Amino acid sequence: MTIFNFTLKGGSSMLVSGPTMAGKSTFVHKLLTSKIFDWQPTNIYWYYGGDTIEGLDGRGYILRQGLPDNFLDVPPNSIVVLDDLMNEGKDHAGLTDLFTKLVHHKNLFVINITQNFFQNSKETRTRRLNTQYVVMFKNPSDVTQIHIIGRQMYPGNPTFLTSVNKNATKKPHSYLFLDLRQETPEDYRVRSHILPHEFPMRIYKQVLDYIHYGKRQAIRKFH
């Protein structure tokens, strides 16, 4: 796997998190028109909350207001976008089935757009643990989320992800991308600039050296 053949895999889900006006929806629109999926989607279903569909008309999406009881009628090889439906979906069992079962059985790609990475319910935690890709947008008002993720991913070097996030999100509307798929090499888990128009892609790696009486320590380096 290299930066030249990077693709998003079918049968996966993505969590896009950040505050209002961070650039989440714009990122998803650009993602959906890019050529970085490893299959050709048959349909794009966009589920939204509230009464507004501003910016969604004319893009070829199949628009749905609110959440259905289940997603059994979504055809295979489709993309499903859940746009800021965290309140409606907090305890929605059908939504959890989408993340844990249907996404794999139907080779779907599910994108969950939310303002809060950590939502306090059993259902949302199950969905989060079954998410393969994470996009964290710059959030000056809450840096604790990236601290917690960093401690979970790199318990031996908990400040690594925090430092990387500062580097990746220096500019407004910037983001950090995490690839949590089982088969992804460790050196390619943390990136930014993944969209084709943003290339060159940036990859953030830990470099391990033997120092201090032979103990292996993690040294931060950005590539």
Where are these regions (language model features)?
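Conserved catalytic segments around the Walker B and adjacent sensor/switch elements
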Residues: Q40-Y47
